[in-house]
Amino acid sequence: MKVALSIPHTEKIEKFMFAKKVIRQKENGEFQPIHRAGLLNLADYEIVEQYNAEARGLCNYYNLACDYHTLDYFCYLMEYSCLKTIANKHKTSIRKIIRQYKDGKTWSVPYETKTGTKRVRPVKIADCKRGEASDIIYQRKKFSWKTTIRQRLNARVCELCGCKEADLI
């Protein structure tokens, strides 16, 4: 007698995606990715990080399932919902966003660090299986500020006392 762990698509995965407003169901029963209005005020790389964190969480949770490869469709829906969110933010099409952020065969969003420019790309199911998609780099806290940390540091104003042009760390 064999015991197999399978992924509960309808009970858990679809409920998760409807709760997060990642997809909607068409009249013919197919799923269509939609943009998430709650993420429009974030920077592009933060939007990708948010989607990656959610996708990695589910992929890691169901990592031992025998039908793990079926999560590929889930990752596809998450990626295109992410693209639709970024496209909606910039009031453009998905095709233009992919062209703008093209990086080889896939797309990735650049962001600045102290050591230079890095890129964040959407997570794929193969990354989760190999363990490459761990949360080591992207440990950001969730804030609802309209400005990014880069904009606040470039303003050269101390957020604590309000003095200007001081050497800020």
Name every feature range the model reports, one short phrase each.
Residues 1-169:
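Non-catalytic terminal/accessory segments
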